[in-house]
């Protein structure tokens, strides 16, 4: 049977409302399904923020998810309201822009984010990519790890485009024209690597060098 994200979210929302009633502060969807880029391997990134989230709430939520179809695909985010309002702002920038609201609003979170938080998101993203790229070249030499780093770079490129242009776009194809030429090269590789199952050692070296140089530039520039 064909999977319908709309039908799944309707069932999910109904079950969450039965479980938590008026304790729901926000419910939404993010990730590849939210961006319209999902494939058969994509996770379901549901977002739920409660008035407060105890361990009992977390366990009850997990048990509720066990009753839903496609349980193995469910990922996402669960927290209490006070925690998300006190969250690292550089994380919240993309969290807010990447999440489709179904119940509630993230406007209160967005109000606390400024340009310095976006620059910090870029710097942290570039630093993490740089560190793991070096680690992979020295120790792992793993193609899947490198592909994951390019995926992370794609999120950093979203922040870069927003910082430079004021426009936020979820889809990579729409993001491309917002970027400078050197950043476009990295994003094109992000898209290409999604279609490649394996990499030769020569490709691993080539793509690692490209990513390392890109991350280095942004660490120093921003």
What are these regions (language model features)?
Residues 1-18, 22, 34-40, 51-222:
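Catalytic core of pol beta-like nucleotidyltransferases
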Residues 22-30:
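Short, glycine- and small/hydrophobic-rich beta-strand elements in well-ordered beta-sheets
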Residues 43-45:
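N-terminal loops that bind phosphate or other acidic moieties
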Residues 47-49:
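Short glycine-rich or small-residue beta-strand-to-loop segments that form or flank ligand, phosphate
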